Amino acid sequence: MAKEEAITVDGTVLEPLPNAMFRVELENGHKVLAHISGKMRMHYIRILPGDKVTVELSPYDLSKGRITYRKK
């Protein structure tokens, strides 16, 4: 059985939360809870409030996501 494709959207980090979690506001105005992807954690990429990021959302739960890219 094939896995569903993740939905990729852009957003802005609102606030950092404990355990490398972040509150992110998406372009459409929704707020989601997102964690850092493994590669970003491995390369010590820091994310601060106000950063523009790319978030992958699961089609099953649109309130949680994974931050995959921090834009310059």
Curated annotation (Swiss-Prot):
InterPro entries: NA-bd_OB-fold (IPR012340), RNA-binding_domain_S1_IF1 (IPR006196), S1_domain (IPR003029), TIF_IF1 (IPR004368). One of its GO terms (cellular component) is cytosol. Residues 2-72 form the S1-like domain. CDD domains: S1_IF1 (cd04451). The keyword Transferase does not apply. The keyword Cell inner membrane does not apply. One of its GO terms (molecular function) is ribosome binding. It holds the Pfam family eIF-1a. SMART domains: S1. It comes from the Bacteria. It is found in: Cytoplasm. Keywords: Cytoplasm, Initiation factor, Protein biosynthesis, RNA-binding, rRNA-binding. Belongs to the IF-1 family. One of the essential components for the initiation of protein synthesis. Stabilizes the binding of IF-2 and IF-3 on the 30S subunit to which N-formylmethionyl-tRNA(fMet) subsequently binds. Helps modulate mRNA selection, yielding the 30S pre-initiation complex (PIC). Upon addition of the 50S ribosomal subunit IF-1, IF-2 and IF-3 are released leaving the mature 70S translation initiation complex. NCBIfam families: infA. Component of the 30S ribosomal translation pre-initiation complex which assembles on the 30S ribosome in the order IF-2 and IF-3, IF-1 and N-formylmethionyl-tRNA(fMet); mRNA recruitment can occur at any time during PIC assembly. This is Translation initiation factor IF-1.
